[in-house]
Amino acid sequence: MIVIVAYDISDEDRRGRLRRYLRRLGLARVNRSVYAGPGTATTAELVAERAKEIVEEGDSVFVIVVREDEYQRAHVFDGRDYYIVSERKYEVY
């Protein structure tokens, strides 16, 4: 399973706290405000609990768990290019 976390947090200190926590869990930055990595529903729950402690009004954090094959079918648009994750052999490990 792959845990994906997308966030919009206005304060740099709070963003940094969440980023450091996500890295400790083994998630990697895949976009400016998106982290992904191997995990389980329990990992997602841990992220959600930590996010509740960090976010304030106006902030948002989105946490989802998908199967790896679903993640590999993700479509990516990066402003210059478009690709499907599996075509780039892109991994979050």
UniProtKB/Swiss-Prot annotation:
Residues that, per the record, bind Mg(2+): D8
User: In this record, what's one Pfam family?
Assistant: CRISPR_Cas2
Name the GO terms of the biological process aspect.
defense response to virus; maintenance of CRISPR repeat elements
Arranged from A to Z, the UniProt key words for this protein are: Antiviral defense, Endonuclease, Hydrolase, Magnesium, Metal-binding, Nuclease
Q: Which cofactor does it need?
A: Mg(2+)
Q: Which InterPro entries does the annotation name? A: CRISPR_associated_Cas2, Virulence_VapD/CRISPR_Cas2
E.C. no: 3.1.-.-
Molecular function (Gene Ontology), one example: RNA endonuclease activity
**The keyword Magnesium appears for this protein:** yes
* SUPFAM superfamilies, A to Z: TTP0101/SSO1404-like
Q: Which domain of life is it from?
A: Archaea
Oligomer and partners: Homodimer, forms a heterotetramer with a Cas1 homodimer.
> Its biological function?
CRISPR (clustered regularly interspaced short palindromic repeat), is an adaptive immune system that provides protection against mobile genetic elements (viruses, transposable elements and conjugative plasmids). CRISPR clusters contain sequences complementary to antecedent mobile elements and target invading nucleic acids. CRISPR clusters are transcribed and processed into CRISPR RNA (crRNA). Functions as a ssRNA-specific endoribonuclease. Involved in the integration of spacer DNA into the CRISPR cassette.
PANTHER family this protein is in?
Answer: CRISPR-ASSOCIATED ENDORIBONUCLEASE CAS2, CRISPR-ASSOCIATED ENDORIBONUCLEASE CAS2 3
UniProt family annotation: Belongs to the CRISPR-associated endoribonuclease Cas2 protein family.
Stated name of the protein: CRISPR-associated endoribonuclease Cas2
State the species of origin: Thermofilum pendens (strain DSM 2475 / Hrk 5)
Gene name per UniProt: cas2
